[in-house]
From Swiss-Prot:
Catalyzes the decarboxylation of 3-octaprenyl-4-hydroxy benzoate to 2-octaprenylphenol, an intermediate step in ubiquinone biosynthesis. Transmembrane segments: none annotated. The keyword Lyase applies. GO terms for biological process: ubiquinone biosynthetic process. Pathway: Cofactor biosynthesis; ubiquinone biosynthesis. This is 3-octaprenyl-4-hydroxybenzoate carboxy-lyase.
């Protein structure tokens, strides 16, 4: 199922009982967060607050609050199908030339999908049905959520920030939180390694003193939103990947105030610029770690135009201790990562980012071990291959007889196959999440690798233990006898 815009997606969700309209007046100050948090933890529907207190614009929350809805947003019916999305990304990252006619025929569907990658530019678009500019620009018209009691101010959480570096043809889409600073000002909290920040750094070097054009789209179609959080190759625009997911080209329109292109069907678009050197202290905010983060300085985004659809919907979320919406999305996107990693490291059997580990700070990898030291090579590969794992603090590597997604299995492997001194890798002074207050200094910390694999002769002089396993003939005989033994009553079974 493909969706042309957010409203198309919401219509389907409502048909399937995956959207709940809330007509009671609910305050964007704290109340929406509490309702959304309770709903998400119960695996509940997306929420459309139709009457936010003090506003006429409805607020959409919990859109991707289940892995199933993330898969649906990517045009799939099941989370397991996201492996196919990962295979497509792996192909785009390092395409292999066809090895013959049969191979060419097998790859034709992928080549056909590539035809949907270029954007389609429109002369007019729904996102520009209403326009405010100059003195009429007022962010207080938008029911921006104030999520937690000690948050510094209301926070734009689901804005797709659109930028272009001075030496690049493609545009970058990234999701960066934005603190409301005034009627026409936001603080753009992007980390130095993210695409928007890199575009800005290059602009400052190429055009000293000149304003950096920026646009922020709110309420884009699900394919475009999810493309912005998917590990697309650096050479590929998120718009192009959204076209692949959607099955037709991403429709865009030129901004009114600059040359950036924004999603034509977006509910709201903020246009403006960053003045070089214009910085402001951002935070504190409750974040996906479950803590309030430190205050730090980030660029100020000055909004010159607000454009929107008639009867626009404001798309929002909150972040907090997992599970929250980013953690749920992490569970779904985990399936996308696996084929990408397997393309580079075929020995990887499974890869898991536990949501309770903030969906990126700890990874469990299972491999078909082939030589001594293999686990350490995989650790280094995980940390260096994709930018998304730059901030992964812990990598646990196990053999393929271990279920990476079962802590009972993983803990057993750690406690029986590891020597803490021999099998632990510690690396100091590596890039670390700025939100990680446990690191010695902001943005710089250490990483730990745990080799929980069975050790080969070159790795230990001792005889290695053999796992206990019952004789298969005995198991088969007891299987046949089990029901007759009636060890558990029906009452016990129900317990």
């Amino acid at each position: 199922m493909k969706y042309r815009d957010l409203r198309d997606f919401l219509s389907l969700l409502e048909q399937r009982g995956e959207l709940k309209r809330i007509s009671q007046p609910i305050d964007p100050y704290l109340e929406m967060t509490e309702i959304a948090d309770r709903t998400l933890r119960a695996g509940g529907p997306a929420l459309l607050f139709e009457n936010p207190k003090g506003y006429s614009m409805p607020v959409l929350c919990n859109l991707f609050g289940t892995a199933k809805r993330v898969a649906m947003g990517m045009g799939q019916e099941d989370v397991s199908a996201l492996r196919d999305v990962g295979k497509l990304l792996a192909f785009l990252k390092e395409p292999d030339p066809p090895k013959g006619f049969r191979d060419l025929f097998d790859k034709l569907p992928k080549f056909k999908q590539v035809l949907n990658m270029p954007t389609k530019r429109l002369n007019s678009a729904p996102c520009q049905e209403q326009v405010w500019q100059g003195e009429d620009v007022d962010l207080s018209r938008i029911p921006v959520m104030h999520c937690w009691p000690e948050d510094a101010a209301p926070l734009v959480s689901w804005g797709l920030t659109i930028t272009r570096g001075p030496h690049k043809e493609r545009q970058n889409l990234g999701i960066y939180r934005q603190q409301v600073l005034g009627k026409n000002k936001l603080i753009m909290r992007w980390l130095s390694h993210r695409g928007g920040a890199l575009d800005y750094q290059e602009w400052c070097e190429a055009h000293p003193g000149e304003r950096f054009p920026v646009a922020v789209a709110l309420g884009a179609d699900p394919a475009t939103i999810l493309a912005a959080v998917t590990p697309v190759p650096d050479t590929l625009s998120e718009y192009a990947f959204a076209g692949l997911l959607r099955g037709h080209k991403t429709e865009v329109v030129k901004c009114l105030s600059n040359d950036l292109e924004v999603p034509a069907s977006a509910e709201i678009v903020l246009e403006g610029y960053i003045e070089q050197g214009d910085m402001a202290p951002e935070g504190p905010y409750g974040d996906h770690t479950g803590y309030y983060n430190e205050i730090d300085n980030f660029p100020v985004f000055t909004v010159t135009h607000i454009t929107q659809r008639q009867d626009a919907i404001y798309h929002s979320t909150y972040t907090g201790r997992p599970p929250d919406e980013p953690a749920v999305m992490g569970v779904a996107l985990n399936e996308v990562f696996v084929p990408i990693l397997q393309k580079q490291f075929p020995e990887i059997v499974d890869f898991y980012l536990p949501p309770e580990g903030c969906s990126y700070r700890l990874a469990v990898v299972t491999i078909k071990k082939q030589y001594a030291g293999h686990a350490k090579r995989v650790m280094m590969g995980i940390w260096s291959f994709l930018r998304q794992f730059m901030y992964t603090k812990f990598v646990i590597v196990c053999d393929d007889d271990i279920n990476a997604r079962d802590w009972n299995d993983v803990i057993w492997a750690i406690t029986t196959r590891m020597d803490p001194s021999r099998d632990t890798v510690l690396i100091e002074n590596t890039p670390i999440d700025y939100l990680d207050f446990a690191s010695p200094v902001s943005g710089l910390g250490s990483k730990m690798g745990l080799d929980a694999t069975n050790k080969w002769p070159a790795e230990t002089p001792r005889e290695w233990g053999r796992p206990i396993k019952m004789d298969e003939d005995v198991r088969a005989r007891i299987d046949a006898l089990w029901d007759e033994l009636a060890i558990f009553s029906d009452k016990d079974a129900k317990r």
